[in-house]
Amino acid sequence: MAKLRFMIKPSLREEKKLWRKGYKTVVCLDEAGRGPLAGPVTAAAVMIKISKSNLKSKILNLKSNLKGIKDSKKLSPKKRDEFYKILTKHPAIEWGIGIVSEKIIDRINIKNAAELAMEKALRNLNCKLQIANWGTEFLIIDGLNLKNNFLKKIRHRMIVKADEKVFSCAAASIIAKVTRDRIMRKLHKKYPQYRFDIHKGYCTKLHLARLQKFGSSPIHRKSFSPVLACNLNPKS
């Protein structure tokens, strides 16, 4: 018998469970750009604004406007941009962005940098929320083995592939990804020989060929093996 494959769609199940427990502020965090050889890592923090009087109507409105939302990696660039515009302007959604440069990535490693980007995203979100002491809030974070001290102090749950399962994490993944892609397109204008507009810094054949031909740029992650190898063995 052929195996049945079930498409997992992000839902509001996790958020609803926490809202029912009394957590009015449920923030979901996700990052974009762990794997690339160049450019920053970005993260987004997303929160759905709720109250007992408008919860049902807001959920119905979100589901209607954002039908088909999923992990950013499973969406076309066009669809990501469409969702980004809806998410960042939706009255029921608050969001913040965090960006950590390639220089800091090289200094503290990519895992720590990704978590720092999440911390920055949460702090930027809090500029809108104005929460003085994080105590009655809850975080849902995509990943495993949280190390960031600021995030660890807040009640949280780590979920592997949360961007595939949790609605607000999928939203965060889209905002983080579109933000980073836009940064890389701007960097392409400064370093056109690498074609960051095409591969966004990821380890593609095109990127490796350009890296081998031109050597690394100031925005390449010098601690990443392909960049390190290129710098140690430049093409003569």
What spans do the regions from the language model cover?
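RNase H-like, Mg2+-dependent phosphodiesterase core
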Residues: 1-54, 59-236
